[in-house]
């Protein structure tokens, strides 16, 4: 499998970004038997990914006096641009969403990614319920960011808070994906299995920072 650079980004908190990060990293490690995975966590508030010992994630310090400092992203991107033999999975908290997008724009990062050997993906989560509109807005901002570049979006549809739907039609069944096929490289559905036992197991897994 080709090495890749993966950012998990969504401006809405509590939608499952760190869960998606853990699942993605485990997929690379267990299903593809890759031992060149670099996992990072930029969240200055909730270092959820760092707590999962098996992922051996690095805490990427991007704050100073409780403020996100854009220049602190520099070492992370330098590592990505100079280590094509690695696959990167970077978990980003809600508070880093806008600063990181600003960093992308200010430093022409999309242009830089045109020259890297790895594929580059931004993974974003869309949920149902009250947070649907906010997560769709986050998607739209990322869509504008990657438009016209080699960077593609992976949409994670998380049914934990309800099935994301537009006009009572599940998002996955609407023309949403087709309409945005120029920027979407794939879709992952985190299904609501409607099982108390399954939900309890997942809750215990995440609370104890375990892997599958």
PLM-predicted stretches and their roles:
Residues 96-192, 196-200:
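Conserved catalytic-core segment of NTP-binding enzymes
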Residues 8-24:
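Glycine-rich phosphate-binding P-loop
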Residues 199-210:
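Preference for solvent-exposed, low-hydrophobicity sequence contexts
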Residues 2-5, 33-97:
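Nucleotide-state-sensitive switch-loop elements of NTP-binding domains
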Residues 19-39:
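A conserved segment at the C-terminal end of the G1
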Residues 26-27, 31, 79, 141-145:
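A generic secondary-structure signal
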Residues 7-8, 24, 39-42, 121-126, ...:
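Extended hydrophobic secondary-structure segments that form protein cores and membrane-embedded regions
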């Amino acid at each position: 499998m080709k090495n890749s650079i993966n950012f998990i980004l969504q401006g809405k908190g509590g939608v499952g970004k760190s869960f998606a990060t853990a699942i993605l990293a485990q997929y690379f490690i267990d299903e593809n038997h890759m031992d060149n995975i670099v996992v990072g966590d930029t969240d200055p508030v909730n270092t959820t990914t760092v707590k999962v010992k098996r992922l051996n994630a690095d805490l990427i310090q991007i704050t100073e006096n409780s403020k996100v400092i854009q220049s602190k992203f520099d070492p992370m991107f330098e590592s990505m641009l100079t280590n094509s033999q690695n696959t990167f999975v970077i978990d980003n908290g809600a508070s880093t969403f806008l600063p990181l997008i600003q960093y992308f724009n200010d430093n022409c990062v999309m242009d830089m990614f045109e020259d890297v050997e790895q594929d580059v993906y931004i993974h974003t989560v869309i949920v149902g319920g009250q947070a649907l509109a906010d997560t769709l807005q986050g998607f739209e901002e990322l869509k504008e960011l990657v438009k016209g570049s080699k960077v593609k979006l992976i949409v994670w549809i998380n049914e934990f808070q309800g099935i994301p739907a537009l006009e009572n039609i599940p998002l996955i069944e609407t023309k949403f994906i087709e309409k945005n096929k120029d920027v979407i490289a794939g879709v992952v559905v985190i299904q609501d299995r409607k099982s108390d036992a399954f939900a309890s197991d997942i809750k215990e897994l995440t609370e104890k920072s375990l892997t599958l």
